[in-house]
Amino acid sequence: MIQSSIRDLNPGKIVCLARTFAKHAAELGNEVPTDPIFFLKAPSALIGPGDAIILPEQSALVQHEGEIAVRLSASLTRASEAQAYNAIGGWSVLNDVTARDLQRADAGRFTRAKNFDSFCPLHPEFIDIADWRQVAVRTVVNGVQRQYGALSTMVFTPGRLLAYVSHFMTLEAGDIVSLGTPHGVDKLSDGDLVGIELVNLEGHCLRRLENPVRVA
């Protein structure tokens, strides 16, 4: 298990994967990709448990995207899937907060919509997972479940995602890679309390990230 505070993590990169769950791709009107799609999220967007997600004045539609993230314990360059799994140092949860109206205005591009300060809540304590096929991500807002997705239902395996990215850029020890969100993304409003949970398939919570939502 990797234990740290958000201040101590200091990742060189935060890499996020898109459209890794087919139903999420469909709810946004997108096709399921034949190869993984990834983008970078700025480390300056990181916040920890209990920190507020700030709704910026530039957006009228900010949405949650609950995801499972991994932290690398070794570097990967042009890696195989087996090498990718061996480089995973731990598993946690991340909220890929997105200004959806800005993303649509930017023809689907990610940078402006996903990199406001506070748009990357992350639980800084990473745990060991014996079998990734036995875990899921769940998003709960004000006590109501909005998202649920088992990793076994993803379009690509975690190893495939990491290996693919490593053929375009070197992934280094300490980097964070977030594996994508299931369907059910929805609007966040001032006063909401959003929780992202890493759960096993029996529903037991292994890790929970909780953040209040506030206007700027």
Predicted feature residues:
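Extended, compositionally biased flexible segments
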Residues: M1-A74, G195, L209-P212
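Catalytic-pocket segment enriched in acidic/His residues
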Residues: I2-D8, H24, N30-V32, R100-A216
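A residue-level signal for conserved active-site and pocket-lining positions in enzyme catalytic cores
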Residues: A18, V70, D96, L122, ...
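Short, acidic Gly/Pro/Ser/Thr-rich loop/turn segments
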Residues: A22-H24, L46-I47, L76-A79, T98-R100, ...
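Glycine-rich, pocket-lining loop/helix-strand segments that form or immediately flank
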Residues: I37-A42, L46, V93-N115
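Short clusters of hydrophobic/aromatic residues that line enzyme substrate/ligand-binding pockets
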Residues: L46, I53-L55, V62, A79, ...
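Short, glycine- and charge-enriched coil/turn segments that flank and shape catalytic ligand pockets
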Residues: S59, A79-Y85, I129-W132
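RNA pseudouridine synthases
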Residues: E65-N95
